Regions:
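Hydrophobic alpha-helical transmembrane segments
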Residues: 15-18, 47, 51, 67-75, ...
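Short, non-helical or kinked segments that cap or interrupt transmembrane helices
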Residues: 34-52, 89-102, 177, 222-235, ...
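Helix-loop-helix "hairpin" substructures at the membrane interface of multi-pass membrane proteins
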Residues: 146-225, 248-249, 253
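Cytosolic-side transmembrane-helix boundaries in multi-pass membrane proteins
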Residues: 165, 173, 183-197, 266-304
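Inter-helical junctions in multi-pass inner-membrane proteins, predominant
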Residues: 13-17, 169, 206-239, 271-279
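Pore- or pathway-lining transmembrane helices of multi-pass membrane proteins that form conduits
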Residues: 86, 90-115, 123-129, 158, ...
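Single transmembrane alpha-helix segments in multi-pass membrane proteins
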Residues: 13-62, 70, 75, 79-96, ...
Length: 304
């Protein structure tokens, strides 16, 4: 049985699913990274992603174009990011309370709108009736075991965005100003730059990436929208940012690790009860944080 499980896990399909799954978390992680650089930790990623997922699939369904859906998701995400920035930066609200509120409000709002559209009274799923899903660009790798092996174009696009974020943060003045707005706001003011403006840029940028992540989740990875479909991926993205030390490349690698665990869990459902395999991604995230904690404890002991 052990050999069968290993054969099921280490297949080309698993690794393609790894990239597809990691993309959702990596995009949200890039958004969280921007707010973290600005001295804020936005834990409302799940809510922004959920609103982006809903806006993306509904916008595409109404227009018949996946491009319109992506733009709708990005716009909604940026608006929510701006709202988060106003509440935290201007009104000095607690960032964690606002993040939790965003998550709760997004679940309630999208559930209400979904049930209003399809008339359901209980938990439901929205399946687009237009053919825009088939027009979303994919990279086709053939068929294996009767299953098509596809990699969505958003996967390589995400890698490009990771490289751009790496360059932006460590090689441009704006990246240094963004970091200074969180660590040394007074020093930033002394050179004539507004730390508040840089924080707003980080918050709106977070909304951009989370909206894009939500659009990919509902229009590409799942090709449908269901209530609470983010399944705490936003919190996993936060864990990836912490594990990756706010470095875009390391955050992407952490997301790939989550993606592999998620893809492997899907392959193991034929051998292990699904209720158990569903916990694997979260157990993997906890293990990542445990390893990081042990490494930090060891460094402190050496420093002492």
């Amino acid at each position: 049985m052990q050999d069968n499980i290993l054969q099921a896990i280490f297949t080309p399909g698993t690794f393609l699913n790894m990239f597809n799954s990691a993309t959702v978390v990596a995009l949200a992680g890039l958004g969280c990274l921007l707010t973290d650089q600005a001295g804020m930790m936005n834990i409302g990623l799940d809510g922004i992603m959920l609103c982006g997922a809903f806006a993306g699939v509904i916008g595409s369904w109404l227009s018949g174009s996946w491009i319109v859906g992506v733009l709708c998701a990005i716009c909604i995400g940026m608006l929510i990011g701006l709202f988060y920035g106003v509440m935290v930066i201007r009104w000095k609200s607690d960032e964690f309370i606002i993040g939790v509120a965003l998550n709760l409000f997004a679940v309630a709002l999208t559930t209400f709108l979904l049930r209003s559209i399809d008339g359901a009274q209980s938990a439901g799923t929205f399946h687009p009736t237009t053919g825009f899903i088939d027009t979303i660009p994919k990279i086709h790798f053939g068929v294996l075991g009767g299953t098509e092996l596809n990699l969505y174009l958003m996967v390589p696009v995400t890698f490009v965005l990771v490289i751009l974020c790496q360059f932006f943060i460590y090689r441009t003045p704006y990246g240094f100003w963004l970091h200074a707005s969180g660590e040394h706001p007074d020093s930033l003011r002394s050179v004539g730059r507004s730390p508040e403006m840089m924080k707003y840029i980080g918050s709106i940028g977070c909304g951009f990436f989370c909206g894009l992540s939500g659009a990919y989740l509902s229009m590409g990875y799942s090709s449908t929208f269901s209530e609470g479909m983010t399944n705490s991926r936003g919190f996993i993205a936060v864990a990836c940012v912490i594990f990756g030390r706010s470095n875009p490349l390391l955050v992407f690698l952490a997301a790939l690790l989550f993606g592999f665990i998620d893809a492997a869990a899907l392959r193991m459902q034929g051998f292990v009860d699904r209720t158990l395999t569903d916990t694997f991604p979260y157990l993997g995230t906890l293990l990542m944080m445990l390893v990081l904690a042990l490494v930090q404890i060891r460094k402190r002991k050496r420093a002492a």
